[in-house]
Structures are given as structure tokens and as C-alpha cells.
Amino acid sequence: MTDLNELKLFATTPHPCSYLDDRDATTVFIDPEVSVDQNLYSQLTNYGFRRSGKHIYRPACKTCQACIPIRVDVETFTPNRSQQRCLRKNKDLTVTVVSTIDTDEHYTLYAKYIERRHSDGDMYPPKRDEYRSFLSAQWGVTKYLEFRNSENSLIGVAVADQLKNGISAVYTFFDPNEQKRSLGVYAVLAQIEWAQKQSNRYVYLGYWIKECQKMSYKTLYKPFELFINNQWLTFI
């Protein structure tokens, strides 16, 4: 097992926060020269790190602790009424786990999603090379959950990394025209179900930010755990 205390970390200079407009952010990255495998990646995820492409990072802001790592305990998870409705609404969908999404069909859906939902974000305009590098990991732990309707049309994809004790939800994109399906919610529920089928314990959802609406939804999947003061605490 790799000694995490021996890993080199590189910190960015303070920069405008992507989630809270009135704050600056500092991010630490794992040395890109480190050889990463599933064991090390799982350890780092358990300590609150995330992946973006080949880079593994964690917030390290001096004056703010708003980004809190969150994970769902799939052994005790129970969907609430709204989530149960979402499951019923999407019972016609077929979920398939695949090993690659480097196809025109998948990229077209991704580009449509970015153009319609995130035209003000860092990934706009969509580019295929960035699509490839952002969503996949060089150490080969990434899988993709496809969502197809009864006509076999691709309407959503959840990108997830397989860990030793669970899965890490990396990114989700879907057809913006299917808004009534609540596919963002469905993608989390599908990943929880996938983890359960694999006898995994957790689904890591990244960072919960109470003051950021687009990140605060993560506490709706209960019970959940938050990584506070270097320990995971359960909230029911």
C-alpha cells in the first residue's frame, strides 16, 4: 500500500472559485509523475480526492471549508418518494455498462448537453479531444452506464470509476430534451444500484457545497457520509 504521506502535492495559486462567486479557491494536485493504480486511487478517494482526466485533486482553500467530500452508503440507502417517482418514470430505460464511449453517438450527445446546459462553463465549446481526456482515466478503472429508451436511442451516460470499496461518480451527461425524466437524479440512482449489484459499499459523489444549489442536492441520497476533520461521519 502506498504511503500517502510520501506523495508530492502541488498547490495552485488562489483563483476565482467555480462554485461560490465571492471566494477564491486553492487546489492541490497529486504529482502527475506518480504511477496511479486502482489501489492508490481508492485510497486517495477515501481521503477526499477527486479525478478530472488524469489529474487527481482536492480543494485546499485557506479561508473556506465549503467543499466537503460526500459518499452514499449503498447498503443502507433507501430512495425517498421523489426518487421512487424518478425510478418509475424511467422504468422503460435500459442500463448497460460499457468500457468506452469514444463514438460519434456518445460524443454527439455530450456536445449537445454542453451546448444546451453548460454554455457558460469551462467545457464550452465542446471539443472531442477534451471529451476523451476529461472523462477517462489512464489507469483503466472507468466504466460508463448507458441509458437507452425503448427505441434504443442513447439519452444519457453516467461516467463512473471503479474503486476497491465502491464507485466514484465522475460525470453525467444526457439529452436536454428529456428534462421530464430527471436524468441527473436517475443517473445517481443507477450508479447506486450498480454498486449494490457489485457488492460495493459506497458511491462517492464528489463535493457537497451547502451554499451552492447545483451541488447541494447530494444530501438527498440518504443516509450519506461527509468527510469532516479527516473522518467519515454518517448523517441520516
From Swiss-Prot:
Q: Does Cytoplasm show up as a keyword for this record?
A: yes
Name the EC number(s).
Answer: 2.3.2.29
**Biological process according to GO:** ubiquitin-dependent protein catabolic process via the N-end rule pathway
Q: Primary place of residence?
A: cytoplasm
Top enzyme class, one word, equals: transferase
Q: Pfam families per the record?
A: ATE_C, ATE_N
Which of UniProt's keywords are assigned here? Acyltransferase, Cytoplasm, Transferase
| Official protein name in the record | Aspartate/glutamate leucyltransferase
GO (cellular component) term, any one: cytoplasm
Keyword Transcription regulation carried by entry:
no
Where does the record place it? Cytoplasm
- InterPro entries in alphabetical order: Acyl_CoA_acyltransferase, Asp_Glu_LeuTrfase, N-end_Aminoacyl_Trfase, N-end_Aminoacyl_Trfase_C, N-end_Aminoacyl_Trfase_N
- Please give the catalytic activity noted in the UniProt record: N-terminal L-glutamyl-[protein] + L-leucyl-tRNA(Leu) = N-terminal L-leucyl-L-glutamyl-[protein] + tRNA(Leu) + H(+); N-terminal L-aspartyl-[protein] + L-leucyl-tRNA(Leu) = N-terminal L-leucyl-L-aspartyl-[protein] + tRNA(Leu) + H(+)
Into which family does the record put it? Belongs to the R-transferase family. Bpt subfamily.
Gene Ontology MF terms in the entry: arginyl-tRNA--protein transferase activity; leucyl-tRNA--protein transferase activity
Q: What is this protein's function per UniProt? A: Functions in the N-end rule pathway of protein degradation where it conjugates Leu from its aminoacyl-tRNA to the N-termini of proteins containing an N-terminal aspartate or glutamate.
Coiled-coil region list: none
